[in-house]
Regions:
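Rossmann-like NAD(P)(H) cofactor-binding subdomain of soluble oxidoreductases
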Residues: 1-51
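Structural/interface elements that position substrates and couple domains in central-metabolism enzymes
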Residues: 15-18, 70, 74-77, 112
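Short phosphate-engaging motifs
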Residues: 16, 60, 105
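Metal- and O2-centered redox machinery and metal/ROS homeostasis
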Residues: 21, 176-178, 218-224
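Acidic-glycine-rich active-site phosphate/pyrophosphate-binding loop
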Residues: 28-29, 33-35, 69-84
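Helical "substrate-binding/catalytic lid" subdomain
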Residues: 49, 53, 63, 76-79, ...
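Rossmann-like NAD(P)H-binding beta-loop-alpha module
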Residues: 53-70
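ATP-dependent carboxylate/acyl-activation modules
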Residues: 69-73, 209, 213-224
């Protein structure tokens, strides 16, 4: 074996928090310590630093602190011991659920302005929110970068994948009795974008046609 008693394994992937306690329990008889670390920052983290949410004991956290300090952004924020083993991945799961909701809200706002005759340049409006607005954020900064090369975003396919964390958050929230309608709506929107609702909507359209004669024709769907 390559590991020795006293060594620490840090899981820095987007792993499910429910697996962390099991991993720690499997390693404990061998004297090997386990920590989980939620990591945020995407491809920009290599230059900006990564936000790190750690789960584990205080002692292990202090032992591994030099590693975390080397990866985090400069300054006082960007690194937190979220709780015991599992806490880091749980915090990152919630972080990603919030991210889903924020991106969905920006998308809905953009689409509403595109459909309106009153806003001539939705991309310019959203880009202007980067300074002084209560909705300014790094996500909006990234969107503004994309707007510079494609103000309509027509080059981007209207499909959004999901990696699982929002679903896990909704499941955890249900167990805890916490309502998460915004996160759920954002997750369902992504699933719908991949055609997951096609058969559902065919059933709905069929029933409308049967009970009320409401026939939906593709070429009659309003576009703008």
């Amino acid at each position: 074996e390559l590991l020795q008693p006293g060594d620490i394994i840090i899981d820095g992937g987007n792993s499910r928090y429910t697996d962390d306690a099991r991993h720690a329990a499997e390693l404990e008889p061998k004297g090997i310590h386990f920590m989980d670390c939620g990591v945020s920052g995407g491809v920009w983290g290599i230059d900006r630093g990564y936000a790190l949410m750690v789960g584990g004991s205080q002692g292990d956290f202090e032992s591994a602190r030099p590693i975390f300090e080397a990866l985090k952004p400069e300054g006082d924020s960007g690194l937190v011991l979220a709780g015991p083993v599992g806490g880091g991945h749980f915090a990152k799961m919630v972080h990603n659920g919030i991210e889903y909701g924020m991106m969905q809200a920006f998308g809905e706002g953009f689409a509403t302005m595109v459909k309106s005759d009153l806003v001539e340049d939705p991309a310019a409006v959203m880009s202007s929110w980067r300074d002084g607005s209560v909705v300014q954020s790094w996500l909006l900064d990234l969107l503004a970068i994309a707007f510079k090369s494609d103000p309509t975003l027509k080059s981007m396919p209207p499909v959004a994948n999901e990696s699982g964390e929002a679903k896990w958050m909704i499941e955890a929230a249900l167990e805890l009795g916490v309502p998460t309608p915004a996160t759920a709506a954002a997750l369902y929107a992504r699933q719908t974008s991949r055609g997951g609702a096609d058969d559902i909507l065919r059933v709905v359209s069929t029933m409308r046609a049967q009970f009320g004669g409401h026939v939906t024709k593709i070429d009659e769907i309003a576009t703008h």
